[in-house]
Amino acid sequence: VFAYAPHYEKLEANAEKIGFVPCKDLKGLTAKADTLVMACKPYQIEGVLSEIKEELKGKALISIAAGWNYDKYEEYLDKSTRFQFIMPNTPAMVGEGVLLFEEKNSLLPEEREEIKKLFEALGIVIELPVHLMGIGGALTGCGPAFVDLIIEALGDAGVKYGVPRKQAYEMVSQMIIGSAKLQLETGEHPGVLKDNVCLSLIHISEPTRP
């Protein structure tokens, strides 16, 4: 695995920790690889593509940058460059992410299967048509921020009543993990699961009633 970043010293330090080969030159990196992952900020993509467009000919490009889907890349890439847009989320950092694969792509079938296997190590892979990638990204990409807000708020409530902060966050985070796993494994409607809690703990039913 080869990697390039503008700040070589930082890249080199990370290479020792993670185990990849750092490259000082973007074009040199592109020449060495058959499949490349575009992981820079969206505003940087146009500049990167202008530098390596020729080197990308005949290669596969995977992009995880929000806002740049297949149709947008098609405007900049040579027709021989194969492409796939993937939208990950932050829980992928711990192997529990949601990886949204845009159905529209130009990868070879065997390439796409290899890429899916690679990203499955980071979480669950879900394929979506082009018109659903926006809302899908909002749900899975922005959703973690709302969950973090809940963790913070419930944790603060625990702290207010004497629970140590670290323990409060641990309790709330595990509760969310367990609740999510219960829904995934049972397939029950979230409303049914909510009612089950309210029936067993009747004193919380009023605040959760619409």
Locate the predicted segments by residue.
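Conserved small/polar residues in nucleotide/adenosyl-binding loops
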Residues: 202-210
